[in-house]
Amino acid sequence: MVNFTVDQIRAIMDKEANIRNMSVIAHVDHGKSTLTDSLVCKAGIIASARAGETRFTDTRKDEQERCITIKSTAISLFYELSENDLNFIKQSKDGSGFLINLIDSPGHVDFSSEVTAALRVTDGALVVVDCVSGVCVQTETVLRQAIAERIKPVLMMNKMDRALLELQLEPEELYQTFQRIVENVNVIISTYGEGESGPMGNIMIDPVLGTVGFGSGLHGWAFTLKQFAEMYVAKFAAKGEGQLGPAERAKKVEDMMKKLWGDRYFDPANGKFSKSANSPDGKKLPRTFCQLILDPIFKVFDPIMNFRKEETAKLIEKLDIKLDSEDKDKEGKPLLKAVMRRWLPAGDALLQMITIHLPSPVTAQKYRCELLYEGPPDDEAAMGIKSCDPKGPLMMYISKMVPTSDKGRFYAFGRVFSGVVSTGLKVRIMGPNYTPGKKEDLYLKPIQRTILMMGRYVEPIEDVPCGNIVGLVGVDQFLVKTGTITTFEHAHNMRVMKFSVSPVVRVAVEAKNPADLPKLVEGLKRLAKSDPMVQCIIEESGEHIIAGAGELHLEICLKDLEEDHACIPIKKSDPVVSYRETVSEESNVLCLSKSPNKHNRLYMKARPFPDGLAEDIDKGEVSARQELKARARYLAEKYEWDVAEARKIWCFGPDGTGPNILTDITKGVQYLNEIKDSVVAGFQWATKEGALCEENMRGVRFDVHDVTLHADAIHRGGGQIIPTARRCLYASVLTAQPRLMEPIYLVEIQCPEQVVGGIYGVLNRKRGHVFEESQVAGTPMFVVKAYLPVNESFGFTADLRSNTGGQAFPQCVFDHWQILPGDPFDNSSRGSQVVAETRKRKGLKEGIPALDNFLDKL
C-alpha cells in the first residue's frame, strides 16, 4: 500500500455517496484477475512495474499454481476524478476522491457459490467478456444472479490483443464482434431484469453511454468511447473556440460519444459525420467507430509489430507519449505494451467507468432493500438500510468466513448496510434460522476487532460506517457460514442467498490413523465454515461425507481439509453422486397404515408433481413462507391444481422447504389438527430418507385422504402417529411406480470444427446427448451444448481432452434432475443397480423393503 494510511481511508468511508462496492465477474479464464491487477496498480497498492503478472487477488498458493481464482478476495482502491470527469456523474457526489471496494470472484462453475457470496455485498459488477470467445455459459449464470440481486452491470471486452494479433480481424469485423457481444449481454439483462419501469430504471449496457470498455488486461490498456470523444473534442476545440467550462465540455463529449458507435459514418474528405453509408458523390464511407477509434489503434499496432523504427518514432511523438528510458530500446510486443499502456492506461479507463456508472450505496440500497431485508419494509432497520444512514441501527450482513493465519479462527466478511460497526460494540448475532421473538440461533456478544481486508493483508481499524465492506474478529464461533449482525432488537434477518448450483457430488473421508478422528471432525467443521457451498454430513453408519458442486470443487475442499483445517493424512472414497427418489404415477391403491396400538388409521396416496413445480420450489417461487391465497392462486393458474386442495397444503419437505408436498384432502375428520404436527414430522422423516435407498425424495405430492382416530388423546400421541405416517407414506410411494432421479450437468464445450466428432463419441459413451451446436460467429470455434449425467462426469474432462488432442474445453454446471430409466424392482435395470450399490454403501439391508412391511389390511 504505497501512499495510503488507514486514517485516510477512514475519512473517505464517511462519504457514502463516494463509495463504490463492485465485483468483477466473468467466465473462467476471460482475464478477471489480470484486469483487477491493472485497477489495483492504478489505485496504488502494488508497484506498477509488476502489474499484469502479479495477480494480486489470487492469494492462495494453489490459485497461483493453477492460474485460477478459487476464493473471492476483497481490496479497497482509491481513485480521484478530475473536475471535468465529475460532471459525468448523474447521482449525488461528495468531493472528488472515490473509495472503490473491489471483489475479484472466481469464474469456474464449481465455485459459483463464492460468486454468490461476493454479489450480495456489492452494488455493481464489472462483467468481463473475452471478445474472441464471446458470452459463455458461466457469464450468463453469474450475470443472471447479479441481475436477480439488482446489481448494475458494466461490460469490459477483454483480450483485444488476441483479436488484433492472433485473428488479424479487420476493423469492420471487430466492430461486428463487439456489437454482437453487447447484444447478447443486453438480451440476458432484458430477460432477467425488471425493465425500464422497474426500480433500477434502464440498466442495459450501451457503448454510447460509456458503460462498455474495450481493451486488453494482459497488455494493460483499455478505453471507453469517452476517452476518444475527449481526445477529439479537445482537438476540435484547439482549432477555433476558446476554453470550455467543465459543464459545457461534458455536454460536448457526450454528444461526441453518440456519434462514435452504431450506424454513423465519417467522411474524411471534409471531416463531417453522416448518417448514411455513402457520401454525396457515392463513395462508401467508413463507420465512425472503425475510422476514429479502431484505425488509430491499428496504426499503432502496425509499425511496431512490423519493426518499422522511423515510423514508430514519429508515431510516438505524434501521440505525445513519454516513454521511460528503458522502454525506448524495446521493439515488437514489449514496445507495443509500453506504448499502449501510456496512451490508453487500463486503470484510468476502467476506474472512470466504475465511478461514473456504478451506483453508490446511497443510490443502490434504496432499491435493493426489499430484496435484502426479510422484515417489514417500514421498521427502523429497513429505513436505515434504505437511506444508508450511519445514525440508524447497525445492520450488517456476513456473507462468508475467511480463514486467518491463526489455525481454526475465521474473519467474518461482510458489509455494513446501516449504522456503524466498531470494536467492542455489543451486538446481536443472528444465524439463518433465527426468527424474531425466539431465542434459537441468536447470540449477544461484543465484537473483538474490526479490520479492513486488503487482498493479501488485513489492517485494523477503529470503526466502519455503513456502505462499506469489513472483516470482523471474534464472531466466527457463533455463525456457521452467513448471518446478520445488528443492534436493533426487533430486527429480522437479511435474506439468505440462493445458490445457482447444488452440492451433488459426495466423497466419504476418514482419517488414515484412527487416533486422528477428533481432528478430522474438527477439520470438517472448519471446512463447512470456510466454503459457502460445501456440506459435511455424518451418516448413521458413522462415515463422514463431504458434498460439493463438482470434481474440482471437491478436490480443492479435500486439499484444504488435509492441509489447513485438519492437518492429518486422509483416506477418501471415490466420488459418489446423490440421487433423489420420486414416483412416476398415482398410487394404484389407497394405502392404509395402522398405528402400533391398532387404534388409529391413516389413508394416503402419492402422485408425481406436474413438470416444473419442483424447480419452482427450488427457486423459491413457491414456498412455505408465502401467503396462502397467493400460493393457491399460483398453483391453480400455472399447474391446474384444485384451488381448495392448494389451500390445504400442510407442509413442504424435507427440512420444511424441499420439493415435496403434503396436502390434506380429508372431509370432516375429528381431532385432525391435533395430529397434524405428528403427521408432518413423519412426512419430514420419510422425505429425507426415502423407501428405496434412504435418499431424499423429490417431486412427490402426498394426499391424506382419510384418518380414523381414537377418541382418547393419550392413544394418539406422537409415538403412535409419527411412525404410522412414515409407513403410510412409504407404502404410497412403493405403490406409485417409484423411480430414481439422477443429477444432470449442462456441459458447454468450446472446440474447433474438426474435433466435434470426437466430442460426440465421448458423450455417447457416457450416456450424454448433444442438444445444441452452434458456431461462434467470426471465429472457427464451435460451441456444443450437451446434457451429461453427473455420475458419468468423473474423468470426463481428461477423456475429452485425450480424444480431441486437448482442443476442447468443457464447462460443467448442474442443470436439473432427470428420472433414471428402468424400474428399480426389475433386477436387470440401471435403477436397481444404483439402489443396490447405495444400500450397500449405507449399510442397509439388501433389497428394497417389501410393501407388506408398510401396508396394513383392514
Curated annotation (Swiss-Prot):
Binding site for GTP: 26-33, 158-161, 216-218
Modified residues (Phosphoserine): S325, S502, S595
Modified positions (N6-succinyllysine) in chain numbering: K152, K272, K572
CDD domains: aeEF2_snRNP_like_IV (cd01681), eEF2_snRNP_like_C (cd04096), EF2 (cd01885), EF2_snRNP_III (cd16261), EF2_snRNP_like_II (cd03700)
Xref: SMART domains: EFG_C, EFG_IV
Effect upon mutating G719D: Prevents H-715 diphthamide modification and its subsequent ADP-ribosylation by diphtheria toxin. Prevents inhibition of protein synthesis by diphtheria toxin
Protein name: Elongation factor 2
The keyword Zinc-finger is annotated on this UniProt entry: no
N6-acetyllysine sites (modified residues): K235, K239, K272, K275, K439, K445, K619
PTM-bearing positions, type Phosphothreonine: T54, T57, T59, T435
Organism: Cricetulus griseus (Chinese hamster)
Keywords: Acetylation, ADP-ribosylation, Cytoplasm, Elongation factor, GTP-binding, Hydrolase, Isopeptide bond, Methylation, Nucleotide-binding, Nucleus, Phosphoprotein, Protein biosynthesis, Ubl conjugation
One of the record's GO molecular function terms: GTP binding
Enzyme kind, highest EC tier: hydrolase
PROSITE patterns named among the record's database cross-references: G_TR_1, G_TR_2
Coarse class of the protein's main subcellular location: cytoplasm
Residues with the Diphthamide modification: H715
Cell compartment(s), UniProt: Cytoplasm; Nucleus
Crosslink (Glycyl lysine isopeptide (Lys-Gly) (interchain with G-Cter in SUMO1)) position: K239
Alphabetized NCBIfam families for the sequence: small_GTP
Gene it is expressed from: EEF2
Result of changing G717R: Prevents H-715 diphthamide modification and its subsequent ADP-ribosylation by diphtheria toxin. Prevents inhibition of protein synthesis by diphtheria toxin
Site (Cleavage): E586, S587, K605, A606
A GO cellular component annotation in the UniProt record: cytosol
Quaternary state and interactors: Binds to 80S ribosomes. Actively translating ribosomes show mutually exclusive binding of eIF5a (EIF5A or EIF5A2) and EEF2/eEF2. Interacts with SERBP1; interaction sequesters EEF2/eEF2 at the A-site of the ribosome, thereby blocking the interaction sites of the mRNA-tRNA complex, promoting ribosome stabilization and hibernation. Interacts with HABP4; interaction takes place at the A-site of hibernating ribosomes and promotes ribosome stabilization. Component of the mRNA surveillance SURF complex, at least composed of ERF1, ERF3 (ERF3A or ERF3B), EEF2, UPF1/RENT1, SMG1, SMG8 and SMG9.
Role summary: Catalyzes the GTP-dependent ribosomal translocation step during translation elongation. During this step, the ribosome changes from the pre-translocational (PRE) to the post-translocational (POST) state as the newly formed A-site-bound peptidyl-tRNA and P-site-bound deacylated tRNA move to the P and E sites, respectively. Catalyzes the coordinated movement of the two tRNA molecules, the mRNA and conformational changes in the ribosome.
